[in-house]
């Protein structure tokens, strides 16, 4: 392990104990339009908690307009509805988030997000409706939920268009809401549902002005709400189009489906920025594998792009801040296979000579590293493994598959290191828990 690198890390290190210590991050924000906050797992309390703390300060001190997360648009729209006190909102953040039903539920249905959503609601209650901060989902997985949302909107504004959309979306009926069945069928049957979802999106965009003017014609409708509901419907139609392409592409393997997903997330981010106006600023919450620049990893060699890379390329390095997270050891919520029950798992000490190992070797505990301070150190430009834990995790095998070769100063502008981390607190328990959490279930924030 390089002494020069350890010395450089110690020089760049800023301790992390209180909200005031986040000044080291906030000082880097300046006038940047997009701040992307990562996570090294989808089940670590400290990643969620510190990310929320940074976000609160970005909203209060820098006037950011929305939070966009690695979640489904329809589910996150209900959080947005509650946080902004829009008509039809649920009674509380716990109820809204507990209704998240797609595995892995714990990603957003957890106490850490409940606390943030309640804070956002309280903060928004003090603002005029047009100044309230929103909460949105960037992901592409909600094919059927998004089609249902489009139909509900059209039924309210255009019965004939709703019937046409119902017939078009009926193309998916044989697959009984099973995306795997549709994906496999598209591999062997030349006739897919692509034209149908593209057509509905095109029609909805073409008639958007008419729908808005007709909704407002009577004079009783709330203009802000009318615009929000139209935007929601258009986004759901876009999700349906891109989800169809994603599942059709997924069965072919390779980088194409990954790229399509991240391109969709960037397209959604672009739409949110445009929707909130030319001076708008957005905060993104996603896994490190999405927000860290792919060009600084081995992803690029595999033909993969990601959100961090694409946003830097689109808006420029000076208008984007990428903040990654890491942990040396601890516990995490994950499943042992896709769809498996959630578990509290032990995260072993990081692999020797990984970035986590080097950060631990400083002996500084939890801290913040502004990575441009490392650019002058030759060892910092070498690729080292950087741990990435997804919703599926098998600790016994992590040495062979959970480390992404990374040039740290190129991948992130800032890294937040939690030396010993703990599992987050999901709202759902497994069916076989008999309603009682296991002894190892996290009880604190």
Predicted regions located by residue number:
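Structured catalytic-domain cores with a bias toward divalent-metal coordination
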Residues: 1-445
């Amino acid at each position: 392990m390089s002494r020069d690198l350890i010395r450089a890390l110690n020089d760049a290190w800023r301790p992390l104990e209180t909200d005031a210590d986040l000044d080291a991050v906030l000082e880097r924000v300046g006038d940047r339009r997009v701040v992307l906050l990562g996570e090294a797992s989808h089940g670590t309390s400290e990643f969620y908690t510190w990310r929320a703390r940074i976000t609160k300060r970005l909203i209060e001190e820098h006037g950011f307009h929305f939070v966009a997360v690695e979640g489904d648009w329809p589910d996150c729209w209900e959080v947005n509805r509650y946080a902004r006190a829009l008509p039809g909102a649920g009674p509380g953040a716990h109820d809204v988030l507990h209704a998240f039903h797609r595995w892995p539920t714990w990603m957003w249905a957890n106490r850490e997000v409940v606390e943030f959503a309640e804070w956002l609601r309280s903060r928004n209650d003090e603002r005029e409706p047009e100044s309230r901060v929103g909460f949105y989902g960037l992901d592409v997985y909600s094919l059927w939920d998004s089609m249902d949302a489009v139909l509900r909107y059209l039924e309210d504004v255009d019965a004939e268009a709703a019937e046409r959309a119902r017939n078009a979306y009926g193309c998916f009926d044989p697959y009984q809401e099973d995306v795997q069945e549709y994906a496999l069928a598209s591999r062997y049957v030349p006739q897919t549902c692509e034209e149908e979802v593209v057509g509905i999106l095109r029609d909805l965009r073409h008639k958007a002005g008419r729908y808005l003017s007709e909704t407002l014609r009577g004079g009783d409708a709330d203009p802000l709400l009318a615009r929000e509901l139209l935007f929601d419907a258009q986004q759901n139609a876009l999700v349906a189009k891109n989800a169809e392409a994603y599942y059709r592409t997924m069965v072919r393997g390779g980088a194409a489906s990954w790229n399509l997903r991240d391109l969709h997330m960037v397209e959604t981010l672009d739409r949110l920025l445009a929707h909130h106006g030319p001076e708008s600023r957005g905060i993104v919450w996603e896994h490190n594998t999405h927000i860290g620049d792919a060009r600084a990893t081995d992803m690029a060699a595999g033909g993969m792009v990601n959100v961090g890379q694409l946003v830097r390329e689109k808006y420029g390095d000076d208008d984007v801040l990428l903040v990654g997270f890491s942990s040396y050891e601890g516990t995490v919520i994950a499943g042992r296979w896709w769809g498996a029950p959630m578990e509290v798992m032990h995260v072993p000490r990081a692999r020797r000579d990984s970035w986590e190992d080097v950060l631990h070797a400083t002996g500084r505990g939890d801290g913040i590293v502004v990575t441009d301070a490392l650019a002058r150190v030759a060892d910092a430009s070498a690729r080292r493994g950087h741990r990435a834990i997804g919703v599926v995790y098998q600790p016994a095998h992590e040495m062979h598959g959970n480390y992404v070769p990374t040039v740290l100063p190129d991948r992130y502008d800032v890294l937040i290191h939690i030396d010993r981390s703990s599992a987050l607190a999901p709202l759902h328990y497994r069916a076989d828990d008999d309603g009682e959490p296991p002894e190892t279930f996290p009880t604190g924030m």
